[in-house]
Regions:
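Active-site-proximal cap/loop segments of hydrolase catalytic domains
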Residues: 149-380
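The conserved beta1-alpha1 loop
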Residues: 136-137, 299
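Glycine/Thr-rich phosphate-binding loops of Rossmann-like dinucleotide-binding domains
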Residues: 11-13, 58-59, 142-144, 243, ...
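Non-catalytic accessory segments flanking enzyme active sites
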Residues: 5, 13-124, 128, 152, ...
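Serine-hydrolase catalytic-loop signature spanning alpha/beta hydrolases and amidase-signature enzymes
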Residues: 140-142, 169
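Hydrophobic beta-strand anchors of alpha/beta hydrolase catalytic cores
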Residues: 131-135, 169
Length: 380
């Protein structure tokens, strides 16, 4: 027999099943509205360990056995769920905090059904409108049951942190048309947001912001060249010029970046010589004059995935055009922040940035005055 993990792509329920290879018979080990992972089987017994989690329940360890488990039932501290015994019950302290609830948002773009995840505070004051941050990369909805551990950010918003501080967070799925990656993101994200506003009346459509990192950072930069719908945006490690990015390398490996545009994620589908206009229209830097949305960029000078100069090109272009833009550079850091102190610093600055534009908070000094390289503290 073998053990397989089952997953429902519509409801996002999951579980483990034991299948007899001779008869085809299937036996349920565990299945339900939660995320099942970290599976282990006993070496000499038909007994299994695994974890289950939901947005409101931290990953806990469970035990299931096809053998006699009456000995486990004698332990009062063990809770039984669907014939599996819960061995741990961790993170009870979260009951003291405002925690997210998650809702599936169904919408359509390019004639296809898409899904997105909307996180909101479990309870909020009646009549109080919520600001919303839209985070995106490509597809995310399969993570419906993922527990969101609060932690300093390496590059993206922490859902639990922002929801506990009075925000809604929406994460839409995106599909792409080759040659039109930026336009595809724009359409899918806007369609998802339209549906959110129809369903969740607490969202303030005048206080919505964007956030993305890497490929998500590129899409963020593209969106603000095409729409003024969003009050502010934060782009991490964004490609801004597909021509110069195509001709660059991944500094961490020395790998050419050309394949990415011709064949994979960047989805242009041609070389610049055969698809000049596609490269131009999908490059945010050439439309920087259209930007009215305040933008925060993070791009680190030791980024081995997206050339640091991509963030610099976008920042310098927007500065020259006197647009509202800020750039964070963590010297020596990579594509995503590694040092905890830097992660904490970024988390604070992202919160202050979004609070200023979406919650009418005071403008922090670093946004009001800036800081030159010479003024940055030197590590000892």
């Amino acid at each position: 027999s073998i053990t397989v993990r089952a997953f429902n792509t519509q409801t996002k329920s999951s579980g483990f099943h034991k299948i007899d290879l001779l008869t085809g018979d299937s036996k349920v080990i565990s299945q339900g509205e939660s995320k099942h992972s970290r599976y282990l089987r006993a070496k000499d017994a038909d007994t299994y360990l695994f974890t289950k989690e939901t947005i409101r329940s931290s990953p806990n360890l469970f035990c299931f056995s096809f053998l006699d488990s009456s000995n486990l039932e004698t332990h009062d501290f063990l809770k039984k769920q669907n014939n599996a015994f819960e061995l741990t019950d961790i993170n009870l302290q979260q009951d003291s905090f405002v925690w997210p609830k998650v809702q599936m948002i169904n919408y359509r773009a390019f004639g296809q059904k898409l899904q997105g995840l909307l996180y909101t505070p479990l309870a909020s004051s009646i009549g109080v409108k919520l600001p919303m941050i839209i985070y995106f990369y490509e597809r995310y909805s399969d993570r419906f049951h993922d527990y969101k551990t609060p932690a300093p950010s390496a590059s993206t918003i922490n859902v639990s942190w922002f929801v506990s501080n009075g925000y809604a967070v929406f994460i839409p799925d995106i599909i792409y048309k080759v040659g039109r990656p930026g336009e595809s993101a724009l359409k899918c994200i806007n369609k998802g947001v339209d549906q959110v506003l129809k369903i969740e009346k607490r969202i303030d459509q005048k206080r919505m912001g964007l956030q993305g990192q890497s490929w998500g950072g590129y899409q963020t930069a593209f969106l603000i060249t095409r729409t003024n719908r969003y009050a502010c945006a934060m782009a991490g490690a964004p490609v801004s010029n597909m021509f110069s990015a195509y001709g660059g390398i991944r500094y961490s490996s020395g790998m050419s970046r050309q394949f990415q545009y011709e064949k994979t994620q960047s989805r242009i589908g041609k070389t610049p010589w055969k698809g000049f206009y596609s490269y131009k229209k999908n490059s945010p830097v050439f439309y920087a004059n259209k930007v009215n949305t305040p933008l925060l960029i993070m791009h680190n000078d030791n980024d081995g995935a997206v050339p640091f100069t991509q963030g610099v090109e976008l920042f310098m272009g927007l500065r020259r055009l006197e647009k509202p833009v800020w750039m964070l550079v963590y010297n020596g850091e990579q594509h995503n922040l590694r040092k905890r102190a830097n992660r904490l610093d970024l988390s604070i600055r992202m919160s202050e940035f979004f609070d200023y534009y979406l919650k009418n908070s005071l403008k922090p000094d670093w946004m009001a005055k800036g800081r030159s390289l010479k003024e940055k503290p030197t590590e000892k």
